[in-house]
């Protein structure tokens, strides 16, 4: 069990860094234990309803609902809601690249993620689980993207910035997977946001905390529905609609401080896991086994 962490609300600068908002810039014109997972569910969920004595497929949950996966000891329970409110405790950043397994067989993973450690800024090189940095993206600012090789351009396009938000979520009139009303209290969550529009939307809310010298944990971000964005194939993807009401404020309780410490511990464990993967992959690349070495070992094993 982690020790109690004292949150001193009089020290904005120190806590802003701990909560991951000190590095936000404002422009004119963001292997560990299980945490409940929040996301936007883009596809409608179909169910069955009896109409005039016949079972008919109907849409029980619309696309664009917020989905919370509450992780249990053996399986997960899913909750959906059109409107939610989140009380953000902190945020972190990482880079992530999805690698599809095009030849996946039944029961095999369809792909895997290359991902970096989580940091309070993306303005530094981050170790990743492939033994490299930044999922292969070059260091520093790229002045001339077109001067890069086509392969490097393609790789960079595949790498996404991820804003990772930790906090407590309250779901308004939640329903289960069958669209049936259910009850749910305030639940701790992690939300990994990699869509660029959603990334900016939540970043704008965190930027307000900086301009007002407020801490995220003291306020609630209200996510009132989602915005549908049409795709060329006729389907849609959805992005959050967010607003922070600074007229309401929350005191920080002992339970909040414990949960804050739990989130910090989770991030440390996640980063330790990624760093372990990094060290192992670096070792594999620096100490490759040549064909001659393999033959020597085989010859040695064959000696009687």
Task: Specify the residue positions occupied by each region the protein language model found.
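OB-fold ssDNA-binding interfaces and closely related basic DNA-contact patches used
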Residues: 2-183, 231-237, 297-304
């Amino acid at each position: 069990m982690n020790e109690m962490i004292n949150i001193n609300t009089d020290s904005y600068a120190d806590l802003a860094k701990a909560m991951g908002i000190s590095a936000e810039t404002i422009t004119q014109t963001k292997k560990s234990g299980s945490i409940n997972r929040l996301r936007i569910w883009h596809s409608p969920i179909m169910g069955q309803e009896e109409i005039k004595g016949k079972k008919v497929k109907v849409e029980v949950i619309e696309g664009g609902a917020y989905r919370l996966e509450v992780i249990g000891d053996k399986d997960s329970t899913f909750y959906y809601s059109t409107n939610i409110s989140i009380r953000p405790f902190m945020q972190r950043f990482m880079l992530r690249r999805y690698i599809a397994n095009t030849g996946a067989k039944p029961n095999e993973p369809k792909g895997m993620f290359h991902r970096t450690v989580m940091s309070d800024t993306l303005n530094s090189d981050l170790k990743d689980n492939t033994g490299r940095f930044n999922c292969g993206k070059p260091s520093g600012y790229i002045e001339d993207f077109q001067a890069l090789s086509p392969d490097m351009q393609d790789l960079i396009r595949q790498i996404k910035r991820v804003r990772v938000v930790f906090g407590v979520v309250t779901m308004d009139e939640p329903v289960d997977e069958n669209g049936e009303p259910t009850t749910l209290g305030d639940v701790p969550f992690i939300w990994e946001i990699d869509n660029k529009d959603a990334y900016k939307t939540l970043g704008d809310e965190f930027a307000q905390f900086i301009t007002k010298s407020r801490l995220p944990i003291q306020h609630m971000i209200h996510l009132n529905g989602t915005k549908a964005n049409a795709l060329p194939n006729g389907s849609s993807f959805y992005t959050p609609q967010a607003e922070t009401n600074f007229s309401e404020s929350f005191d920080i309780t002992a339970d909040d401080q414990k949960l804050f410490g739990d989130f910090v511990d989770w991030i440390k464990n996640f980063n330790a896991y990624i760093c372990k993967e990094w060290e192992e992959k670096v070792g594999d690349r620096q100490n490759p086994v040549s064909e001659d070495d393999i033959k020597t070992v085989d010859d040695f094993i064959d000696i009687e």
